[in-house]
């Protein structure tokens, strides 16, 4: 099965119900789809009125070993009293298979949206990220990747070169902006950071609030620098971001040491995410869900904006990184 051409069109509701029934779960409600483009995720209630979420993994994105590492990390975090959504085991197995689809079942965890502009909530998140990374430092992922330039920049650049989605009249300017951004990131990238297991996609949308934070969706977990799990929480102008980062770090360091030199990786990581995200959209374009939900990807205005965004981010990389107050 070719990853780029795969769709979930064969994953019918009956297939999902049968997969759950094989594990002794009888669905007593409908299957409510949750917001996920990469995988297929559904919330439901069983006959005992317990609420669960079932997640069907996109084939060939992660291997079984890589998914199991994600599950093992989540279970270790729960054991260390870090609030994450961890998979349910059936006969000792968290990774299940039905008709060629890998899937897992999670308890449904409700909660309010995390308020990124709430300093008290930000402090609590920083504290639990410190605890998460305390667990993350105990060992590294063996099968899951480490954040680096090849996956996030070099491979996407090759994809852009051959892409037919980019309007022909705009492609040269877009590739030039991409090359300038890659050069700027490469000049500021460091390979000497301490590597640990990360959440990997720790933004406000992946944190629920229930008298404290609840971290969800470890699908992008990988090895990398600690700052990767901090920088996406920052918002607002430089002064606001400085205050937020200082709040996070102070709480974080109650449990884990933080290397402030990693702050210099924030803008390189932001640039890498911009490039990687666009490549992800293009790789998934054969899946009907993507043209339906991202129709603007075929428009000239979108590519003009992307080109301008890449040029602007390359300029940002020439500026001094975010500075903390002298006490740090």
Swiss-Prot record:
Q: Where is the active site?
A: 201 (proton acceptor), 217
User: What is an example of a GO molecular function annotated in this UniProt entry?
Assistant: magnesium ion binding
Q: SUPFAM superfamilies per the record?
A: Protein kinase-like (PK-like)
Q: Does the keyword Magnesium apply?
A: yes
**Could you tell me what reaction this enzyme catalyses?**
L-seryl-[protein] + ATP = O-phospho-L-seryl-[protein] + ADP + H(+); L-threonyl-[protein] + ATP = O-phospho-L-threonyl-[protein] + ADP + H(+)
From what superkingdom does this record's organism come?
Answer: Bacteria
Official protein name in the record: Stress response kinase A
């Amino acid at each position: 099965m070719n990853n780029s051409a795969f769709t979930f069109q064969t994953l019918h509701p009956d297939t999902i119900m049968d997969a759950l029934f094989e594990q002794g779960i009888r669905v007593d409600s409908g299957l409510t789809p949750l917001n996920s483009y990469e995988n297929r995720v559904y919330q439901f209630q069983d006959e005992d009125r317990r609420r669960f979420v079932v997640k069907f993994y996109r084939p060939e994105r992660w291997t079984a070993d890589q998914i199991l590492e994600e599950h093992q990390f989540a279970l270790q975090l729960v054991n260390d009293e870090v609030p994450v959504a961890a998979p349910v085991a059936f006969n000792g197995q968290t990774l299940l298979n039905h008709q060629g689809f890998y899937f897992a079942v999670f308890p449904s965890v409700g909660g309010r949206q995390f308020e990124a502009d709430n300093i008290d909530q930000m402090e609590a998140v920083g504290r639990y990220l410190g605890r998460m990374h305390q667990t993350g430092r105990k060992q590294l992922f063996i099968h899951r990747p480490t954040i680096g330039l090849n996956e996030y920049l070099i491979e996407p650049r090759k994809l852009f070169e051959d892409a037919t989605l980019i309007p022909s009249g705009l492609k040269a300017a877009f590739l030039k902006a991409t090359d300038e951004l890659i050069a700027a990131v490469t000049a500021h990238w460091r390979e000497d950071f301490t590597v640990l297991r990360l959440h990997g996609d720790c933004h406000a949308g992946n944190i629920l609030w229930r008298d404290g934070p609840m971290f969800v969706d470890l699908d992008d977990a990988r090895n990398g620098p600690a700052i990767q799990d901090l920088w996406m929480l920052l918002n607002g102008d430089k002064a606001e971001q400085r205050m937020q980062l200082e709040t996070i770090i102070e709480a974080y360091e109650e449990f884990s040491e933080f290397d402030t030199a990693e702050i210099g990786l924030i803008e390189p990581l932001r640039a890498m995410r911009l490039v990687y995200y666009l490549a992800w959209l293009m790789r998934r374009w054969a899946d009907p869900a993507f043209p339906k939900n991202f129709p603007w990807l075929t428009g000239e205005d979108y590519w003009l904006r992307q080109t301008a965004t890449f040029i602007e981010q390359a300029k940002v990389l020439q500026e001094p990184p975010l500075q903390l107050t002298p006490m740090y």
